[in-house]
């Protein structure tokens, strides 16, 4: 029953309504591109500095309560953004928005893993999480199309609908309870110093440190750039194919829908992929396959469209596998904080990739920036593998 409610919660989380019109909305409120960039920076900085404290709170007050706090903040923030018409209120709301996701980030996976542990089925984490992502992405595909239509009527409407759908998640969460595995830990006695010690102990393990660099820094950093440059590259490719400029926005809405559907299908089969391919083979092959695709796009730009669909589809499956791998190697006490620490490192790692790729894109082109990212991914992954194989077959 808890897992079915988890799927329902994931469906309310997939609020892609505002995604196709997000930047159009900000421009319509009179914001400059510089101000939009400042909003993104505020979001990332809040994520960076908020991950550990919110993970700690999640370990203290409970996974369910942490998710409840985060979801409530997000729903109110989305409503606020729809009502805003200037930069300063949006800046404050962006900080709140990021904090809402901080409360969710470590606690969601920690709640799911501990719930599965109650039933002695923690090995099913990747499969169940994958199914949850599949539900979220399938709902998101429809939401992207609906959001584009609502935005053509009024750019505020998608934000209001997204706030309403997110608030349904609050109702779902109120019907959930914390797992028995979590309740049996002495979480109320968990001090901040003890929490930092737990994170430090995890990061002193050489293999986990290698995995952190391999996936959370290198792979996550480079593939993040794909999501940043999708729109300008998509526009370049379809215009070269003879599509009229006036059709680009509507095509983007449908491409985002396709993008979500590919992710939904692959996420649904996460468990099958894990059994067939195995975590070790997946992580050893993936960086080099993605790297080859990114470099190939530069020489054949048309390859960008299937490459974007594939990398998007693989991202959620890979995140589920990474969550399974880390969760298998950490204890229940402090779990949310450790997972938040991983997210924090990943958020910090993205910054130099963002700055470097921005300069390269302005100087040459976004396609060239992604090709450079591909070379960095292959070279860095190879170097880490020579130093320490990041994936072990057995838990430890």
What do the PLM-derived regions correspond to, one by one?
Residues 49-88:
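Conserved MFS/SLC helix-loop-helix module at the cytosolic interface between two early adjacent transmembrane helices
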Residues 94-138:
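Cytoplasmic helix-loop-helix junction between adjacent transmembrane helices
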Residues 27-28, 87, 139-162, 231-243, ...:
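Transmembrane alpha-helix termini and helix-breaking/packing motifs in multi-pass membrane transporters
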Residues 72-86, 91, 174, 288-301, ...:
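C-terminal ends and interior cores of transmembrane alpha-helices
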Residues 173-214, 236-240, 288:
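Juxtamembrane intracellular "pre-TM" segments in multi-pass secondary transporters
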Residues 1-34, 95, 203-226, 309-313:
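Pair of pore-lining "gating" transmembrane helices in MFS-fold secondary transporters
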Residues 18-19, 25, 156-160, 201-265:
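A single, central transmembrane helix in multi-pass transporters
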Residues 162-187, 386-396:
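Helix-loop junctions on the cytosolic side of multi-pass membrane transporters
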